[in-house]
Amino acid sequence: MELDMVPVTIESLAIRMMPQPSVLSLRPSKALAIPGEENDEVYDHVLPIWIGPAEAAAIASAIDKSRSERPLTHSMVAQLVRSMGGSVNRCVIDRVNGTTFYATIYVRCANGMFTRVDARPSDAVALAIRADAPLFVASNVLKAASFPRSFKPGADLKLEMEEFHKFVEGVNPEDFVTEGD
């Protein structure tokens, strides 16, 4: 069953040390939306996902295109897929249960067939960046776990981000438990 998927980009990444979780915030991308769907209410939302500091560091390293003397895990996985004639087709955050998000990495194999790999969202995001693959979130996940975006067009982005980070510091993952949990 194919999910209704919404293209997303990284809104922000707040890296914190334990015991506080780091927060990855994803924002639906109107620029990447299917024409006609960019006015859907989910495009004015942000999806916070709590991750560990090591996972946040891996995403930050991918965003910054940092190079290391030896390949990091996500770079190695992307290289492994390419060396076998495949490609990372897309990464999808496709499910949420309470405060736990789930992702699927879609790999196009050398024979043209696709295979799906279960992944943590943090790994899917880090790999998508390293493999230059699109990132999506299932619309039902956005509707269940996202929040209206408080940023206003033309607003001071730095001030808005500071306010968002203050908001993030005052919440816990349990604040985002979805119905039925």
Task: For each feature predicted by the language model, list its residue ranges.
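Divalent-cation
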Residues: M1-D181
